[in-house]
């Protein structure tokens, strides 16, 4: 195998998905710690302390203890290169998470052992399903009084429609939690919340007398449980996992470091290396020597001192080298990239080289757009995930009219990076924001104030849902003339129908049967 191919095969690019408060940020920190990327795992709960979670760098995140933005963290582990894409953990930030999930080859799903499968988990898993993304599952918080493990597996299977293959099995829970049994190598890891890595001792074999010495009567309970689990659960099938049909399940307690290393080992051993990617014209293989990639996130003003914008680009093929010239397919322009960066949350490092599966940051001043494809010359267009119709709408009202230009620039930039969607009705001067969740409006207001110097208020706007319009020029002109107050342009100058209620939407659809009213639109 060539050195280039071996570099590609070493890559593991994944994201963590979960419902808020299931422990995603804690798990992210502990994975970084086990991987040697950080010396001390930040205590996520200590919101008032000076130290905050490494992956939560925005001021609003520090105040609220949530992961609002997506960041990228790269670290070596067991002769592999891990690319961990942190995703917004709050349920109001799902669309940004959707886009991040287009850039990964696999995902880790975190389930709270107390609450089981929750709403946001279902939404995010459905996005992963669109690409049959392989999923590893980590059932967290076993140090608390939890639901029965078999009940949790049943719920995952019935609610998410995915086979579970337990890889480890817990010994007790809450105050009686003693560790886990590894079903595939017949070892037991004992839990100690005071041990540095959460593990007090590891022994071999269920029949080992040391097991009885350490946990007494729980040893016989474990032997019975394991016999039942082996008989009743699915055996691990790697191909089913890679096809997105089965999820290997691990149990642990991220806050206590327990079970995290087994999960990280599974990412290396089970998760796929960079996968082929679809474009509008052909499939791109990760081992092709020519560079290609797509932008899945734009982040403005990551560092207020720099006042810059960073385009996060997933490399799909080839090798990136500092100073190389790459083509922005949408414009035909060539960029000479001398200052591509990689991230450890807010820490920036200039990158000399990167390979398929890696994420690089390209500094720019608004010339790079969400979904842009870059190549060494070939006219490719990577296709991916749609933008989703917002569920909430607000009208922006500026408090100082002299700042209108700054408001327009700020809203445009924030919409381009995915913080919200921006709509401009044809027959008014209103600036309408659309979001998947209400907290996004708080984030936009906060960033407008602190990054653009604009004090803005958001008013309720009479809109129940939005639909992108697709049809002939004549039909689009006709609906715009008839429903001018409801038809708007989005940030890409595409027609959107803003329906005040479902009845109004239905009437418009019946009146214009040749126009498609779309809940999603392809942005890649």
Swiss-Prot record:
GO terms for biological process: regulation of translational termination. The keyword Nucleotide-binding applies. Residues 9-275 form the tr-type G domain. Transmembrane segments: none annotated. Keywords: Cytoplasm, GTP-binding, Nucleotide-binding, Protein biosynthesis. Pfam families: EF-G_D2, GTP_EFTU, RF3_C. One of its GO terms (molecular function) is translation release factor activity, codon specific. GO terms for cellular component: cytosol. GTP binds at residues 18-25, 86-90, 140-143. Increases the formation of ribosomal termination complexes and stimulates activities of RF-1 and RF-2. It binds guanine nucleotides and has strong preference for UGA stop codons. It may interact directly with the ribosome. The stimulation of RF-1 and RF-2 is significantly reduced by GTP and GDP, but not by GMP. HAMAP family: Rel_fac_3. This is Peptide chain release factor 3. It comes from Methylobacillus flagellatus (strain ATCC 51484 / DSM 6875 / VKM B-1610 / KT). The gene is prfC.
